[in-house]
Each structure stands twice: as structure tokens, then as C-alpha cells.
UniProtKB/Swiss-Prot annotation:
It comes from Drosophila willistoni. It comes from the Eukaryota. The lineage of its organism: Eukaryota, Metazoa, Ecdysozoa, Arthropoda, Hexapoda. One of its GO terms (molecular function) is RNA cap binding. PANTHER family: 20 KD NUCLEAR CAP BINDING PROTEIN, NUCLEAR CAP-BINDING PROTEIN SUBUNIT 2. GO terms for biological process: mRNA cis splicing, via spliceosome; negative regulation of viral genome replication; primary miRNA processing; regulatory ncRNA-mediated post-transcriptional gene silencing; siRNA processing. Residues 30-108 form the RRM domain. Its main location: nucleus. This is Nuclear cap-binding protein subunit 2. CDD domains: RRM_NCBP2 (cd12240). Belongs to the RRM NCBP2 family. Component of the cap-binding complex (CBC), which binds co-transcriptionally to the 5' cap of pre-mRNAs and is involved in various processes such as pre-mRNA splicing and RNA-mediated gene silencing (RNAi). The CBC complex is involved in miRNA-mediated RNA interference via its interaction with Ars2 and is required for primary microRNAs (miRNAs) processing. Also involved in innate immunity via the short interfering RNAs (siRNAs) processing machinery by restricting the viral RNA production.
Length: 154
């Protein structure tokens, strides 16, 4: 197996099953996790990029669990493992909406996983960010809440 399609060290802590079941699922999966997307990247843009590597079966955009707005990740499922491997080789680390995107193996989409797992509804990584990132909603959400003036106590 080529280095570009090997499993990374990341493991979904919410996976339902044993570590060996998760490893097996990842090694057989046709589903990819795509991260570091702009909040403004569309499903159509994802489809255009990933369909260069094969027939895309399904795209599930990651959503803020409260606002139901995009929050910077998605799942892309192919019909075959070889198509997904091509995407791992050729799409991981490329630019989309002026951002370097990350592509990693996923054990398979399960309903509910499309929602951010952070306290504020988005991704955890966006809650504590201290730098300003226009493509991902500005400053980190928890930092923004501390900075925002409290208008309730007037």
C-alpha cells in the first residue's frame, strides 16, 4: 500500500465497536473525511473536485448542530475503495477555496456524525482558535463569546 493511502493515527473516539473493528472498517472503507474546509465551500465544489478521482456516491456536509450551517468538514463516499484511494493520493493537501484541505479515511458515515461536536455546535478545533480565520467564522467561538459585549445587562 502506498504511503498516501495508509491509515493515519487519528481515530474517531465515538466509533461504536472495538479498536480492531475500527481498523478493519477503515481498511475496507470507501468513505473519506475531508477537513479544513471553508464554511463557504459548497457541496457542488466538493463534488467537482472529488469526482475527478471516481464516481462519488454520497457527500454529507458537516453542519453546526445548532444553526445547521456548514462548519468546515464533510464526508465523501465513493462506490469503490480504489476510487477513494485515488482521492487520498491526489486530493489530500490540495487547495479548495484557498485552503489546504485534509483528507483521511473514515469508517463510514452514520446519521448524526454530520454535526459538529463542539460545545457551541461547530467543530472543537474552531472553539479554541485564537487566530482570525475569515473562512472559518473569524475568531474561535469561545474566544468570540468572551470578547462580545454582554447586551443582556442594559
Amino acid at each position: 500500500m502506498s504511503n498516501s493511502v495508509e491509515l493515519s493515527s487519528y481515530r474517531d473516539q465515538h466509533f461504536k465497536g472495538s479498536r480492531s473493528e475500527q481498523e478493519r472498517s477503515l481498511k475496507e472503507s470507501c468513505t473519506l473525511y475531508v477537513g479544513n474546509l471553508s464554511f463557504y465551500t459548497t457541496e457542488e465544489q466538493i463534488h467537482e473536485l472529488f469526482s475527478r478521482c471516481g464516481d462519488v456516491r454520497l457527500i454529507v456536509m458537516g453542519l453546526d448542530k445548532y444553526k445547521k450551517t456548514p462548519c468546515g468538514f464533510c464526508f465523501v463516499e465513493y462506490y469503490t475503495r480504489s476510487e477513494a484511494e485515488s482521492a487520498m493520493r491526489f486530493v489530500n493537501g490540495t487547495r479548495l477555496d484557498d485552503r489546504l484541505i485534509r483528507v483521511d479515511w473514515d469508517a463510514g458515515f452514520i446519521e448524526g456524525r454530520q454535526y459538529g461536536r463542539g460545545k457551541t455546535g461547530g467543530q472543537v478545533r474552531d472553539e479554541y482558535r485564537t487566530d482570525y480565520d475569515a473562512g472559518r467564522g473569524g475568531y474561535g467561538k469561545l474566544l468570540s463569546q468572551k470578547i462580545a459585549p454582554n447586551t443582556d445587562n442594559r
